[in-house]
């Protein structure tokens, strides 16, 4: 996955949305813009969908054609400058998928994250030993070097929970996550200790969805919802799959996931009862 690929960031997505809106407001089709500026129609599509980052001269030509004056013009040019800055995923691009790299960048700038996990602990809360056990089991063919980079990425991601304006994290775990022995008893005890330590933070809420809750909306799989501090940046959903990952945008789809999460947290144990369940699991492992 090495190379000069464009990894999505919050600012690149914002610039793409801005340029699409400007073109629509100017009443111009992509074909007309292409004819007047010489910018390929495919390139315009990629720029407006944040799949490509425009060069400054390309952006200037678009702004000129759309008749964009100050302060919007400076805002767009500044977004391009900001979009050139490497995101958190820059250090790990060779070890992660393009979509996951984009997710890491989004997570680093998010205001809040809502996780539902049905199979294993959220990456933000994993210990190094737990993460190693997960990767060795789920991705047995990847190299030790890639595994090491991925684990380092997860450990560095956790910094969003401790910065001055920390990420607000709400996690709902299926009970299966705490019952499944990953890496052995010692690894699980350490992992539970990490979980419990994080529940003491004011910005972290953890709930367990018990087996006796029965059928639930999350049975189709895990997902993450990200919200951002700027209203110009719409919330999105990250879904991790076996063959590929997916970032979902668009109000109707994202709203459905939001409703699902609300249903799951309503069905889950209270944070206090969830902590009690984890503490009981620790005692069972240590006995």
Residue ranges and their predicted role:
Residues 165, 172, 182-287:
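C-terminal regulatory/effector modules of DNA-binding transcriptional regulators
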């Amino acid at each position: 996955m090495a190379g000069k690929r464009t990894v999505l960031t919050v600012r690149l997505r914002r610039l793409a949305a801005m340029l699409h809106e400007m073109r629509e407001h100017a009443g111009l089709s992509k074909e007309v813009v292409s004819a007047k500026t010489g910018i390929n129609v495919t390139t315009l599509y990629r720029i407006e969908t944040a799949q490509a980052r425009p060069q400054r001269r390309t952006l200037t030509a678009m702004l000129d054609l759309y008749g964009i004056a100050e302060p919007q013009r400076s805002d767009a040019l500044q977004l391009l400058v900001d979009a050139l800055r490497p995101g958190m995923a820059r250090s790990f691009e060779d070890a992660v998928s393009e979509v996951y790299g984009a997710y890491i960048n989004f997570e680093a700038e998010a205001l809040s994250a809502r996780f539902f996990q049905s199979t294993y602990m959220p990456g933000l809360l994993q210990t190094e030993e737990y993460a190693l056990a997960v990767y060795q089991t789920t991705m047995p063919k990847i190299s030790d070097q890639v595994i090491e980079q991925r684990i380092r990425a997860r450990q560095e991601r956790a910094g969003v929970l401790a910065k001055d304006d920390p990420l607000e994290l709400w996690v709902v775990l299926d009970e299966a996550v705490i019952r499944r022995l990953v890496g052995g008893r010692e690894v699980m005890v350490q992992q539970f200790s990490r979980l419990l330590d994080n529940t003491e933070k004011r910005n972290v809420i953890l709930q367990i969805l018990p087996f006796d809750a029965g059928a639930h909306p999350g049975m189709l799989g895990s997902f993450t919802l990200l919200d951002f501090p700027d209203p110009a940046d719409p919330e999105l959903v990250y879904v991790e799959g076996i063959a590929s990952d997916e970032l979902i945008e668009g109000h109707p789809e994202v709203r459905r996931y939001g409703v699902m999460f609300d249903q799951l947290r309503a069905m889950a144990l209270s944070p206090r009862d969830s902590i009690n369940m984890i503490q009981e699991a620790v005692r069972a492992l240590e006995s």
